[in-house]
């Protein structure tokens, strides 16, 4: 199998996924998954698509990710891995789609408006 490319995005994070046959090595920005992400919960979030199709140690994955924080990056990586797996084998698509791994979460930070302290918070109003 050749190398398969996919892209995942979430908030301001962009993850580029390079998936190939292997024995389950996942590296992010040339470091291991466990070193890059501090929390065990985030690591399981990244591995969810692989666990769903029971292919946790069939593919080597190289990931370049930039922008955002840990959670946004992890969700971008999860989307990218799910998209790459669908390219490898289209029969994975229904189970991944059912779990919501192929849905791009389009929520972004709302912009700050002039005349306000934040996006929605106003300055204190005094009637008199």
Curated annotation (Swiss-Prot):
Pfam families: Ribosomal_S9
Record's keyword annotation contains Ubl conjugation: no
Keyword line: Ribonucleoprotein, Ribosomal protein
InterPro entries assigned to the protein according to its UniProt record, in alphabetical order: Ribosomal_Su5_D2-typ_SF (IPR020568), Ribosomal_uS9 (IPR000754), Ribosomal_uS9_bac/plastid (IPR023035), Ribosomal_uS9_CS (IPR020574), Ribsml_uS5_D2-typ_fold_subgr (IPR014721)
A molecular-function term among this protein's GO annotations: RNA binding
GO cellular component, one term: cytosolic small ribosomal subunit
GO terms, biological process: translation
NCBIfam families in the record: PRK00132.1 (NF001099)
HAMAP family (UniProt xref): Ribosomal_uS9_B (MF_00532_B)
Family label: Belongs to the universal ribosomal protein uS9 family.
Protein name (database record): Small ribosomal subunit protein uS9
Originating species: Amoebophilus asiaticus (strain 5a2)
């Amino acid at each position: 199998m050749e190398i398969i490319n996919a892209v995942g995005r979430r908030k301001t994070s962009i993850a580029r996924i390079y998936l190939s046959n292997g024995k389950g090595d996942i590296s992010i920005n040339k470091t291991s998954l466990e070193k890059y992400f501090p929390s065990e919960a985030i690591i399981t979030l990244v591995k969810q698509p692989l666990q769903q199709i029971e292919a946790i140690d069939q593919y080597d994955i190289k990931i370049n990710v930039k922008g955002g924080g840990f959670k946004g990056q992890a969700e971008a990586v999860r989307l990218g891995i799910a998209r790459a797996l669908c390219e490898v084998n289209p029969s994975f698509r229904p189970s991944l789609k059912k779990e919501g791994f192929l849905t791009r979460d389009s929520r972004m930070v709302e912009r700050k408006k002039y005349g306000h302290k934040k996006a929605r918070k106003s300055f204190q109003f005094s009637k008199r």
